[in-house]
């Protein structure tokens, strides 16, 4: 319970605390636009990272959809430090487009939880994912040179974003062929998300799982992740190498853990 209270505090801080960095740290490959999200009855600010050679090339690119865009590219907009996604991808010369979706501030918990929690509420991730799949992705595929097939489409996030990214692979397996699941907050919908996975018959998604062993006062983050991986492996041979799991010694529930783990995840997922 103490762990859950600490995590919920972090979740709320994501939505309410502003960073006072004086200058933007986003690279010139990053741009933004706003799009209506009728499923959520709001508008969403979208961040777009394009590879360094995008403008000089005619090739098509795989796409990664990521949550909490405020924390991905720019220290000025982040809660407690950015992921440095743009700088890391530039250094790798990664041939991938990243689409960051800003969280809904005080609606973050609501948008990034598949089911309503009796204590904390939420439960509108289905609407949020419908926005991504039916409104945002078509816009991205029309505007940019993308490889739109599921094998070239990844979804990635941390904490509630990790939970919703996993849920997305069960809800839309025909859309998302890969996922980066960092410190997933399975606990907030534990009963429902495990039941959903148990009912799932086939699973071909490629998963990269990451969490730290010091994310709370108990080991529920690690045990939940181990349990979920076990359930997945009961439906396919581990020899297929479709999932990778990293438990970081001393890793805590914060941007540093996710920032430090991003490159290894990207490389393992094929970028």
Regions found by a protein language model. Name each.
Residues 1-25:
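Bacterial Sec-dependent N-terminal signal peptides
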Residues 22-271:
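Non-catalytic cap/lid and distal C-terminal segments of serine-dependent acyl enzymes
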